[in-house]
Amino acid sequence: MAVSFNTTLHQPSLSPSCSIKLYSGLKPQSASFLASGYQNLNKEFYGRVYKSLQSGTGKASRSRVKMMPIGTPRVPYRNREEGTWQWVDIWNALYRERVIFIGQNIDEEFSNQILATMLYLDTLDDSRRIYMYLNGPGGDLTPSLAIYDTMKSLKSPVGTHCVGLAYNLAGFLLAAGEKGHRFAMPLSRIALQSPAGAARGQADDIQNEAKELSRIRDYLFNELAKNTGQPAERVFKDLSRVKRFNAEEAIEYGLIDKIVRPPRIKEDAPRQDESAGLG
């Protein structure tokens, strides 16, 4: 005896008490919007989002959607080839504009990310400048030297900008930028010193580590002398201990070329020479 079962699948209905709202563009849609599927997010949609973000009035409005993501901020970015807008994280947007931001301790993982980004941008267009923004304490010796050597090996010119602090090897990278394109903000602080190590083990191991550290120190100081125009003897003497610079002192020493002054304070800010101006 054959027994057949007739079953009917019913899609669950949405209760109005759920208060579900979906947004298409900048206007709220009813829950029935689910039945028709999501609309195609095209150029017009992203254009409305971008215009909304640009012309926000700050007034409370139920129909206005303010996207405030948790974690890495996302921004609208226009694809130049396709002419469409899309949401990307802020670091991705900066990379696409050839901007590299170093705002943390430089370790092996972070250094590899910076190296890969610089090499990729150089292969895309080696005639356009890469902009490196620095606001960090420096980092490990070998990863920082890898960034320096890569900067010098690229065909693309690399400009450097200090937007807060550039300590130790971050200051060394700041001075390694293209001449004429090394900038700092008025309140930037730069500190340089001799590289340090923490050798442990047998006496021979410690001695070998000290020799290697001295070799790297000599290389760093000689390169810094070339980049700043200072005599090597002065660099060795000045950096035997921590030496700190403000923006004006960094210009005098040759670490940077100009001080970037925002337009709102450009007229009121004191200037000591012609090189201090809007970058």
UniProtKB/Swiss-Prot annotation:
It comes from Arabidopsis thaliana (Mouse-ear cress). Component of the chloroplastic Clp protease core complex which consist of at least 16 proteins: CLPP4 (3 copies), CLPP5 (3 copies), CLPR4 (2 copies), ClpP1 (1 copy), CLPP6 (1 copy), CLPR2 (1 copy), CLPT1 (1 copy), CLPT2 (1 copy) and 3 copies of CLPP3 and/or CLPR1 and/or CLPR3. The core complex is organized in two heptameric rings, one containing CLPP3,4,5,6 in a 1:2:3:1 ratio and the other CLPP1 and CLPR1,2,3,4 in a 3:1:1:1:1 ratio. InterPro entries: ClpP, ClpP/crotonase-like_dom_sf, ClpP/TepA. Required for chloroplast development and integrity. Involved in the regulation of plastoglobules formation. Belongs to the peptidase S14 family. Residues 1-54 form a transit peptide. This is ATP-dependent Clp protease proteolytic subunit-related protein 2, chloroplastic. HAMAP family: ClpP (MF_00444).
